[in-house]
Amino acid sequence: MRKLSSYIGRYWYGYVFAVASMVTAIALDMLYPKITQKIVDDVILGGQMEILTKLLTGIVLVGIGRSIFGYCKEFTFDFLSSKIGAEMRKDLFNHLQTLSMRYFDDTNTGELMARVKDDVDKIQNALGYVGMLLIEVTIHVVFVLYCMFSLNWKMAFLPVTVMLCCAVVAIIMERKLDKVYEDISEENAVLTTVAEENLAGVRTVKAFAREDYEIKKFLSHNERYYNLNITQSKVLVRYYPLFQFVGKVLPVAITILGGISVMNGNMSLGALVAYVEYSRNCTWPMEMMGWLTNDLSSAVASYKKIKKIYEVKPEIEDSRNVVTLDHVSGNVEFDHVSFKLDGKQILSDISFSVKEGKTLGIMGATGSGKSSIINMLHRFYDTTEGSVRLDGVDIRKISLRQLRRSVAVVLQDVFLFSDTIEENIKMGNRSTMQMDEIKSAAASAQASSFIEKMDEQYETVIGERGVGLSGGQKQRISIARALSKHSPILVMDDSTSALDMETEHEIQKTLNSLKDTTKIIIAHRISAVCHADEIIYLQDGRIAERGTHEELLAKKGLYYDTYMAQYGGYLAS
């Protein structure tokens, strides 16, 4: 992760301008007590009425200048923090895109949403308004103390001592808040995850009448989040009143001490008035200390959470010596492939090859490792043993971009984006795809019939995760998306399970017409794979049977049992 200093360094000129504007505005602020001193000593007590107009004009000009430079300061800080926040969000999102599937298997979506949105917002706030105030408080205090020392250096030791004490208290407060904010950030991510999962699966929740259970689960996390915020509040209310008390008492103490100096002839009345004004300028930084410490502690906790994400390195990366294939024919070979995940053996000694334009069918019981073959081919995971080759080249040597562009896939768990049907179909070939190609892909996937009955047709906006469409309709749009990619390899993972037999037959005819496309079809239905050039049947991560449809039936093994389970009743009748 780039350090915050590197983000700030990119816009150093902006921060220089903002700080210069701030210094100018603060310097102008320091003139008010000086002018007040002149009015008291020279006009009221000295009777020099002729300079009153000049002094009043000075107040107006100082006010105008203060407003202009104050605007420049605040606008620049806001602009720069928004810019840096956007860049941090972009960099974090880009980093997430590089991470391997294993990371997303182990990390909740709600947690990542909290990091990308809430935590970056807190850092952005720290670099903007909070950061501006922190710098302003520091510069303001330096200017005020300089002016106070120039008026009466003995009395200036009082505010210096008070400020040092407040700084120590602020450090103690920050240390107490640090762990609390880390816990709050963590629980916020959990709460977001619970809410996101519940709302995404609201139909399932209602179908199983699980509303009460989900409410209790949410409330338990909500209560913990509430308790953590109460813990935070207890720390704040313990220290906030101290800062406010000191801020109110200091001007009074200065007035008393200054009054004694005036009576002893060591200070003019105007100087005392100016000194009290300067002391009031000391109070708001002290009152702000608690608030600034609170927000900075929150931002630091958020930064630590984001930093942890950047510490995660992608397990799947391009090799140093990438091989670029001039033309991908689509020859796929698994050579003694084995795969373990979290110590569990998923695939064992899998070997097969599919030539260009040929079709491989893969069957097996749930959990037999069928979908893991897709994960290997896409390099979502790397093999534990053996190798996967594309056109004779180990896919670990091919760039991930070229590899994944060469494979179109229809996943078992169909995911459609909250966008138009058109955008969902042309996702795989977005930059060059024309409308007639989209319609052709939809027709090939038997999707055009229901799409064109919709009021907006291809401009129809699909609800979140395809809400509003049936399972079969979602599968057909997903198939159209894969076909529109025109990749040399097409993988279908149980992608016709929600289709009626007639629609499945039409799609099968489309697949058969793709003579130059290598097809790997994973299915539970015999009808989806019976036309394949070769069929492999997996059991417990191993190839138990292989052959053509007719050869496997003749063996009367697992494939035959599946066939009889699906068609036995029909054959008997």
For each predicted feature, which ranges?
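Hydrophobic alpha-helical transmembrane bundles that constitute the permease/transmembrane domains
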Residues: 19, 23-34, 63-71, 123-126, ...
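Short intracellular "coupling" helices and adjacent cytoplasmic loop segments at the cytosolic face
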Residues: 45-46, 82, 90-114, 118-120, ...
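An intracellular "coupling" helix at the cytosolic face of ABC transporter transmembrane type-1 domains
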Residues: 101-102, 118-127, 131, 135, ...
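Helix-loop-helix
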Residues: 48-50, 54, 147-162, 231-304, ...
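Hydrophobic/aromatic residues in alpha-helical transmembrane segments
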Residues: 32-36, 73, 77, 92, ...
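Transmembrane helices of ABC transporter permease
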Residues: 10, 14-27, 57-58, 62-65, ...
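Membrane-integrated ABC transporters
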Residues: 1-29, 36, 44-56, 65, ...
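ABC-type nucleotide-binding domain
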Residues: 319, 325-573
